[in-house]
Curated annotation (Swiss-Prot):
Similarity annotation: Belongs to the bacterial ribosomal protein bS6 family.
GO molecular function, one term: structural constituent of ribosome
Transmembrane helix in keyword set: no
Function: Binds together with bS18 to 16S ribosomal RNA.
CDD domains per the UniProt record, alphabetical: bS6
Keyword Ribonucleoprotein: yes
GO cellular component: cytoplasm; ribonucleoprotein complex; ribosome
Domain of life: Bacteria
Keywords in alphabetical order: Ribonucleoprotein, Ribosomal protein, RNA-binding, rRNA-binding
NCBIfam families named in the record: S6
Gene3D superfamilies: 3.30.70.60
Entry protein name: Small ribosomal subunit protein bS6
Length: 119
């Protein structure tokens, strides 16, 4: 499985509870439709935008880190496109985190092998 990061920005004029439901809906979509394993959900809340987005100067930011095969990522894109509450979204493959994870796994494996040799 590959590691991905998705950031999405929700309109600020929606009630806080509703924005929370929308963010949780994205997480549920990832789990159900993409069979993704969620590593972390980071809700930033309302922040100023770098420039106006559809006449909004601030928006609600959320970042989700997840693991998936990547086969159905276009479904995630469509999920965001058809819902007007999203101002922007972007999904990245996090190759740096994948490499870091592999490197850590190799170190653990090496330590285990060294311990077996010493016994």
């Amino acid at each position: 499985m590959r590691i991905y990061e998705t950031m999405f920005i929700i309109k600020p004029d929606i009630a806080e509870e509703e924005r929370e439901k929308i963010a949780n809906g994205v997480v549920e979509f990832l789990k159900e439709k993409l069979n993704a394993q969620i590593d972390n959900v980071d809700r930033w809340g309302i922040r100023k935008t770098a420039y106006p987005l559809k006449k909004y100067n601030e928006a609600d930011y959320t970042v989700v880190y997840f693991r998936a095969t990547g086969e159905n990522l276009n479904e995630l894109e469509m999920y965001f496109k058809v819902r007007p509450e999203f101002l922007r979204w972007q999904t990245f493959r996090r190759i740096d985190l994948e490499k870091k994870e592999r490197k850590t796994a190799k170190k653990v494996e090496t330590v285990e092998n060294t311990e077996k040799v010493e016994e």
